[in-house]
Amino acid sequence: MKYSAVPVIFVIAIAALAADPFYLGTWKIDSAVVGPWWNSPGKPDPSESKTLVGKTLTITPTAILGPGILGCKGPKYKVVTIPPEGLFQGAFEEMKRADKSVDVAKLAATLGFTGKTSKSLQTGCANELDFHFVDANTAEFALNEFVYTLKKQ
C-alpha cells in the first residue's frame, strides 16, 4: 500500500489555520462615539477620534501595528470573559457606583453588547488598551472618552 504525504500536510495546515486566535488580523476603525460615561457639559474634543476613524490596525502574535498610541510591541495577550460591568476598564461599574439607577446591561447594549458576558482581549501593552468583542468581526475599545468600533477586514 502506498501513502501520500500530501493529505497529511493538508490536514496539518488546516489545523494550524484553525488554531489561529480569532483576534489576529487587520481591523479597520469604523467609527467613534462619545463614551456613555462622559458627563461633562458639551462634548469631548473630537479631533483625535477624527484622525483615527478609517485607519487600520493589525494584530499579530508579536505586535499590534497601528497609528500612534494604538501600536504595541511585545503584547502579552490574554482572552478573558467579562460581564458588562467589566467593559472599558470598569467604566460602567463606576457609573453604577455613582448612581444606583444605572442599568449596566442597557448601557452595554447601546454599544452592541447584548449577552451576559463578552470576550475581551487584554493586550498587556503600556497603552492599557483592551479590545472587547461584540462578535467575531466587531470589536470596541475606549480611548480618551470615545468608544471606537473596529471591523475585521
Language model segments and positions:
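Bacterial N-terminal signal peptides that target proteins for export
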Residues: 1-7
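N-terminal signal peptide c-region/cleavage motif recognized by signal peptidases
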Residues: 13-15
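Short hydrophobic/aromatic-rich beta-strand segments that constitute the beta-sheet cores
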Residues: 29, 64-67, 139-142
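Short, surface-exposed coil-to-beta transition loops
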Residues: 52, 125-128, 142-145
